[in-house]
UniProtKB/Swiss-Prot annotation:
MF terms in GO: D-tyrosyl-tRNA(Tyr) deacylase activity; Gly-tRNA(Ala) deacylase activity; Ser(Gly)-tRNA(Ala) hydrolase activity; tRNA binding
Entry similarity comment: Belongs to the DTD family.
Gene Ontology CC terms, in alphabetical order: cytoplasm
Catalysis performed (reactions): glycyl-tRNA(Ala) + H2O = tRNA(Ala) + glycine + H(+); a D-aminoacyl-tRNA + H2O = a tRNA + a D-alpha-amino acid + H(+)
Gene: dtd
Placement of sequence motif Gly-cisPro motif, important for rejection of L-amino acids: 135-136
Keywords for the protein's UniProt record, in alphabetical order: Cytoplasm, Hydrolase, RNA-binding, tRNA-binding
EC category: hydrolase
Entry function: An aminoacyl-tRNA editing enzyme that deacylates mischarged D-aminoacyl-tRNAs. Also deacylates mischarged glycyl-tRNA(Ala), protecting cells against glycine mischarging by AlaRS. Acts via tRNA-based rather than protein-based catalysis; rejects L-amino acids rather than detecting D-amino acids in the active site. By recycling D-aminoacyl-tRNA to D-amino acids and free tRNA molecules, this enzyme counteracts the toxicity associated with the formation of D-aminoacyl-tRNA entities in vivo and helps enforce protein L-homochirality.
Intrachain S-S bonds: none
Domain remark text: A Gly-cisPro motif from one monomer fits into the active site of the other monomer to allow specific chiral rejection of L-amino acids.
Enzyme Commission numbers on file: 3.1.1.96
This protein's name: D-aminoacyl-tRNA deacylase
């Protein structure tokens, strides 16, 4: 499982012209793009949620848990793109939707159980993501 985390001053996700998830933190929040591979499980989702919640990448070396920063979670199978051969990425390392969707949901729910305010995109939908990356700060978490 991979989570590409961006520190943001605002972010939103739109599906079919409708905003389905948005954060407008004061002053910062996190955008988490989540990719799932074949051997991932609920335990990995829980551990990554805990790591993200405590990750000290906000101002003054604080974490989202320290300042109740909101998190926007968006599924992102392209985090498992393989570009070793040719010019067209392979998505073979990405788990199929039937495996990935429940694990993205588990990741999201684990964050909520930890106390996070979480907004989400729509799994499998074509999404337009708008964000203002603060810093910029972008970190890849992987288990």
């Amino acid at each position: 499982m991979r989570v590409l985390v961006q520190r943001v001053s605002r972010a939103q996700v739109t599906v079919d012209g409708e905003v389905v998830g948005a954060i407008d933190p004061q002053p910062q929040g996190l955008l988490a793009l989540v990719g799932v591979t074949h051997d991932d499980d609920a335990a990995k989702a829980q551990r990554l949620a805990e790591k993200l919640w405590k990750l000290r990448i906000l101002d003054d070396e604080r974490s989202a848990s320290d300042v109740a920063a909101p998190i926007l979670v968006i599924s992102q199978f392209t985090l498992y793109a393989n570009t070793d051969k040719g010019r067209r990425p392979s998505w073979n390392a990405a788990a199929p939707g039937s495996v990935a969707e429940p694990l993205v949901t588990e990741f999201t729910e684990a964050l909520r159980r930890l106390g996070a305010t979480v907004e989400t995109g729509v799994f499998g939908a074509h999404m337009e993501v708008e964000l203002v990356n603060d810093g910029p700060v972008t970190v890849l978490l992987e288990l």
